C-alpha cells in the first residue's frame, strides 16, 4: 500500500468548492440524528460519497456508508479524505468515537479502515444469517477514538 496524497493536495484535486444543500424532507429522520453526507467530485463527476450520524445515546458517530464509484479514483486518497471529513463532523458533534460496520470477507475494506486508524472493537457471528461463520461473512465493528 502506498502513502495517500496529503489532504491539501487532495483538497485541491477533488474538492474544488464546498457546497451545502437543503432538503425538504429528512432522510431516515426517524432514527438518524443530524446526519451528514460528503461527496468527492472531479468536475461534475461524483467519484464517491460518505455519510454518517451522531448517536447521542452512546456518544459515538456512526459511519453508515462510504463508497468510491470511480475505479480510477480508488487508491488515490479519495476515501481517506471522505473519512477525514466524517471525522471532522464527528469531532464537531462532540462524539468520542467514530464507528462503522464491515464484514470479515471484505479484506480490502478492513485494510483501508486499519490504514486510517480504525481498530476492531467487536464481532457479531450471526448478524446476517445463522450460517455467517461458515460463509466467512461475520459482522465486524471497527472504531477510532476521537478523544
Where are these regions (language model features)?
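Active-site rim helix/loop that mediates acceptor-substrate recognition in acyltransferases
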Residues: 1-37
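Structural preference for beta-strand elements that scaffold enzyme active sites
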Residues: 37, 60, 97-99, 141
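Short strand-connecting beta-turns/loops that link adjacent beta-strands
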Residues: 43-45, 55-58, 105, 147
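Conserved acetyl-CoA-binding loop-helix of GNAT-fold acetyltransferases
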Residues: 68, 75-90, 111-115
Amino acid at each position: 500500500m502506498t502513502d495517500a496524497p496529503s489532504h491539501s493536495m487532495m483538497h485541491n484535486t477533488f474538492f474544488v468548492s464546498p457546497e451545502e444543500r437543503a432538503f425538504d424532507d429528512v432522510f431516515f429522520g426517524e432514527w438518524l440524528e443530524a446526519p451528514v453526507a460528503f461527496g468527492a467530485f472531479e468536475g461534475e463527476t461524483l467519484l464517491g460519497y460518505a455519510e454518517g450520524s451522531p448517536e447521542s445515546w452512546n456518544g459515538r458517530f456512526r459511519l453508515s456508508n462510504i463508497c468510491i464509484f470511480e475505479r480510477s479514483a480508488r487508491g488515490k486518497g479519495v476515501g481517506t479524505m471522505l473519512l477525514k471529513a466524517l471525522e471532522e463532523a464527528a469531532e464537531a458533534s462532540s462524539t468520542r468515537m467514530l464507528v462503522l460496520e464491515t464484514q470479515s470477507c471484505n479484506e480490502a475494506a478492513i485494510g483501508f479502515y486499519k490504514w486510517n486508524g480504525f481498530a476492531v472493537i467487536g464481532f457479531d457471528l450471526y448478524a446476517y444469517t445463522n450460517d455467517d461463520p461458515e460463509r466467512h461473512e461475520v459482522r465486524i465493528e471497527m472504531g477510532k477514538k476521537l478523544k
